[in-house]
Amino acid sequence: MDKIWLILTREYTSRVKKKSFLLATFLTPLLMGGLYAAAIYFAVSDSEEKIIKVIDESGLFVDKLEGRNSVVFEFVTEPVDSARKKVENGSFIGLLYIKDVDIDDPQGINYYSMTTPGIDLIRGMNRSLETVVRDAKIKKMGFSKSALDSLNTDINITSINLSGENEKEGNSGIAMAVGIFSGMLIYMFMLIYGSQVMRGVMQEKTSKIVEILVSSVRPFHLMMGKILGIAAVGLTQFILWIVLTVSIISIAGPLLGGESAEDMVAAQSGIAQAELAQSPEAQNKLLAAIDEVVDSVNIPLLVGSFFFYFLSGYLFYAALFAMIGAVVDSEADTQQFMMPIMLPLIASMMFLGVIIKDPSGPIAFWMSIIPFFSPIIMMIRIPFDVPLWQLVLSMTLMVLGFLGTTWMAGRVYRIGILMHGAKVNYKVMFKWLMMKN
Amino acid sequence: MDILNAQGITKRYANHLALSNLDLAIPNASIFGLLGPNGAGKTTFLRIINQIIFADEGTITIENRPLSQNHIEMIGYLPEERGLYKKMKVGEHLLYFARLKGLNRTEAIKRIKVWFKKFDIPDWLDKKVEDLSKGMQQKVQFIATVLHEPKLIILDEPFSGFDPINANLIKDEILELREKGSSIIFSTHRMESVEELCDHIALINEGVKILDGPKRDIKNQFRDNIYSLEHLTPIKELPDGFEIKTSQKIDEGMTETIIHIADNQKANDLLQVLIGQTEVRSFSEVIPSINDIFIKTVKEQAHG
C-alpha cells in the first residue's frame, strides 16, 4: 500500500505542477464565464428593433398588424417600385407588400429584402398576418370576439411526485437540466482523465521506465497508483473549476445582469450597477430559483450518487484505458482499441434525448443498470426519481463492473507492458488475460 | 556461501521454451557473468529473479530463503530496456526510485548527495532529465540501481550504449561494490566486454546451461597447450612432441608461428630449442577467449 501511495503522489504532483494543468484549471472558468457573458450580450443586443416597411393595398392590415420577436411594422404609402428601390439601396431593411387580397384565399403577399430572411422572421410575419385575417373572418361570420376568446382555456398541470416522504411539486425542467449537467460532467471526466491514464501508461512503456518500476512494485500496484493519482488530479481540477466558476459568476453575473434588458432604463439613468445587483428584487428571484431546485430534487441523493458514479465510472473506464495503454507501442495504435470503449460512451450521449423523454422507460432502465452506460444514464434519471431497487442494482453492478475491468486490465497490463513490437490484437489480449503468472 | 541459488528453473512461452531446467549458484561477493547470444534466455532469468515474471518450475533461494517480495529491497536491477521520466528532475527521480525500493526520504537524499560528489556532478539535483545527454542519463540510471545498497546487483547489457569513459567509470564502481560485499550479475551477449571483470561465468544457449564455474577453471579446462611465438629467422626443425600448426610472416622479417606442445612436454624445453634456432621476440600461451570457448562448446554439443 505504501508503494501505491508513492506512485499516486508522483502521478499527482508531476501533473499538478505542469503548466498545462494550471492553464486549463484557471482558463476554463474564465472561458465559461466569457461564454456566459457573450450569451447574455447577444441576447441583449439581439433585442434591437427590426423595422419592416409595409405597403398594404388591401387596407385590411393597417394599424392591426402586430410585430413579433422585436419586429416592428411601419406602414408606408408609396408605389411598390420606388419602395423596392429603397430596399435595394439599403434605406429599407425589408419590405412587406400586401396586394388587395381576398381574405378567404390570401395569395400574393411578398417580402422583399437584400438577404434571405431567417425562418423565425418569416414565421413571425406569417403569424402576425394570420391573426389579423382570423380576426377579420370572425367579424365577417358575426361571432363576438370575446365569446370566442372564452373558448380558450389555459390549463397548467402541476405534477406531484408521491414517491418521496412528502408530496412535492416536481419540476421536470429543472430535473432535466440537473440530470443532463451531471451526466455530461461524468462523461467529460471519464473521457479526459481516462485517456490521460492511457497516455501515461503508454509513455512509461515506450520510454522503457516500466521494467525498472516493476522490479520494485507489482504491476497491479503500479497501475492502481496511476489510476488513483490521475483521479486525484481530476478531482482537484473539478473542485477548482467549481469554486472559480461560482466566484466568477457571482462577481460578474450581477454586473452583466444589470445590463440586461430588465432595467436598462434604470442603468441609463445613472444608478450604479452594483447597487442594482443588490436590489432585493434580483436577490429574491435568485433565491426563488434556488428554492425551486432544492424542493424538486433530492439533493443529498443527487450529490451522493453523483460522487459514486463519478468515481466508479472513472475507475471502470480508466482500467480499460490503462489496458489499451499497456498493449500498444505508439499513439497511432490506440485508435483501433479506443473504438469499442468510446462506443458505449457515445451511445449514452446519443440516447440522452430518449432517456429524458421517458426517464422510466425500458431503454432508460436497461441502460441505467449496465455499467458501460449507467454512470451517465443513471445520473440523468436520478433527478426524475428512480425506484430504490433499481438504484441499488445499478450501483452493485457498477461496483462489480469496475472490479471486473480492473482485474481484467491488471492481467493484460502485467504482460503487455513488457512486450515491445508484438503485434497485438484482441486474440492476443485474450491470451494474455488467460495467461497464468 | 551463495547469495542466490536457482534450481531447475523452467519457463515456457506460447511457442518456445525460454529456460529449461536451469541450475545456477551465484557466490557471495563475486562478479558473475551470465553469457549467451541474443535469445538465450538471459533476460527471462533476470526477470524471474526480479519477480517480474514467474518460473513455471523450479525454485530460487536468496540467502537460503525462498524468493519473496521481501527480497525486492536487496536487489538492484538495471534492465536492458531502461528509461527515465523525461520531465522529472534528476534529484526527484532518484529519490522516487530509492523510495520505491524502501529507502526513507532523508537517507535517500543523503546517499544521492554522496553519489553526486563521487561522480563529480553536484549541480544535477535540479536538472531535468530531458536536459541530460545520453551518457549523463546512464550515470543517473546506474546511481538509481545501486542507491539502496543492494546486496545483489543485476545488470543486463550494462555497457550497451555507454561510451568508453562511462564504461570504465562504471567498471570501477562495480569492482568497488564487490569489495564492499555485493554480488553482481552481468548479463551480456558481448562476451569480450565483461571477460576481464568476471570471477564466475555461466554460458547459456537456447535456454540451456552449457558451462558454469569460476572463470579460471573454465579457461584452464579449455587450454590447448598452444603457444604463440614471434621470431626473426625461420625455425628449422622441432623435436618430437612439438608441432608447428601455422607459420606466417607478419612484417619486416618478423614471423608468427603457432606451436602445439604435447601433454608430456614443457613450454620451457620448447623455448630452449627455439633460442638455439632463431631470435625470439615474444613467446606466450594462447588462452582461448570466452567467445572461443562458447563457440567451441556449442559446436561440440551440436555434433555430440
Regions found by a protein language model. Name each.
Chain B
Residues D2-A6, K11-N205, L211:
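ABC transporter nucleotide-binding domains
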Residues T10, S68, G91, M191, ...:
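Alpha-helix N-cap/helix-start and coil->helix boundary motif
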Residues N70, K219-N220, A267:
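A short local loop/turn or secondary-structure capping micro-motif enriched for an aromatic residue
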Residues D172-I258:
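ABC transporter nucleotide-binding domain
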